[in-house]
From Swiss-Prot:
It is an enzyme of class 4 (lyase). Belongs to the enolase family. Catalyzes the reversible conversion of 2-phosphoglycerate (2-PG) into phosphoenolpyruvate (PEP). It is essential for the degradation of carbohydrates via glycolysis. It comes from Rhodopseudomonas palustris (strain TIE-1). This is Enolase. Coiled coil: none annotated. Keywords: Cytoplasm, Glycolysis, Lyase, Magnesium, Metal-binding, Secreted. (2R)-2-phosphoglycerate binds at Q163, K337, R366, S367, K388. The active site is at E205, K337. InterPro entries: Enolase, Enolase-like_C_sf, Enolase-like_N, Enolase_C, Enolase_CS, Enolase_N. One of its GO terms (molecular function) is magnesium ion binding.
Amino acid sequence: MTAIVDIIGREILDSRGNPTVEVDVVLEDGSVGRAAVPSGASTGAHEAVELRDGDKARYLGKGVQKAVEAVNGELFDALGGMDAEQQVQIDQTMIELDGTPNKGRIGANAILGVSLAAAKAAAASYDMPLYRYVGGTSARTLPVPMMNIVNGGVHADNPIDFQEFMIMPVGAPTFADALRCGSEIFHTLKGELKKAGHNTNVGDEGGFAPNLPSADAALDFVMAAIGKAGYKAGDDVMLALDCAATEFFKDGAYVYGGENKTRSRSEQAKYLADLVARYPIVSIEDGMSEDDMDGWKELTDLIGSKCQLVGDDLFVTNVTRLADGIKNGRANSILIKVNQIGTLTETLAAVEMAHKAGYTAVMSHRSGETEDSTIADLAVATNCGQIKTGSLARADRTAKYNQLLRIEQELGAHAHYAGKAALKALR
């Protein structure tokens, strides 16, 4: 009944207008699972490989026909007839077939598309929502959203060196209320930026990209918008940063182009500690460069007890890198991006390892997204309590929020909004 009878890959467009892979997995009983694969702009050097064609005459070299051919040919040949319920076996078969440590031969974009589509097909066969199929009966926690409302770094054409300034509505009683809170602050911020003469166009992830000189200036605007929208910063709403520090780490130092300043490893740690002391910041992602291991340790020792320190480029959803971080006291949280590792099985293993070690986990989108809302279900399935999926604009971002609204409604009285309990610093 759940045997795989067809796997169909195709090239579609992501939210940046670049090609990406979409996969349909068809089962013997007629059930179909569909998954579209996201793509990142600021990518970690240790991520699984996204296979691109490299033909400059077609999509400027960004086509994914080779990955699609692998889906329709090699992967279907290997998986046809296999039971879609056997997720671990399916994923392991693809990993072994690829034969490289980073999925570089077949491509993580091909492998992930099949992996997620197979799980969705199996869920459909049982007439179960994906969050229930993957997470079982205990999957009922709606995550606190990290809403990226100001963009900088490689996500924007402005002087701000940090990539994302986010709000977290931790004081809301439900996910629906949290979403409303975020939306009201987002629109209030737009008005405040406009009033101050700033551009209010949105970036890749739906946040504003004003021409501000520093992180302090961006944080001040966000704080003002929270208050003007009728909420209390530090109680109803907390702040979060994604520094994406790898992007401005050069020759052993942190080079702030927008501020025309260079900070040493220790100065970087102290600067972030100072921001945490002056603003209600409860989470900092990639505050140090991906390979600055001493910097990560210094930052964790300095503020790890009072702030969530999320490893994105540091861990790349990889259990080997995560285990090393846990052992050596680097960071205290992991960002979970399905396409960084390339299979559902490995994604779930990373969340499990983090939770067992007392690390938090944050389910995350990429800057190049689609209308696929799988990560919303996975956030609930894993009870991770936090999701990072952009701003309150652009359909590729709101698709995930809308799916979480549906899940909360479906769970009814059993639904639980993570709120302040999602963050150890607020418990």
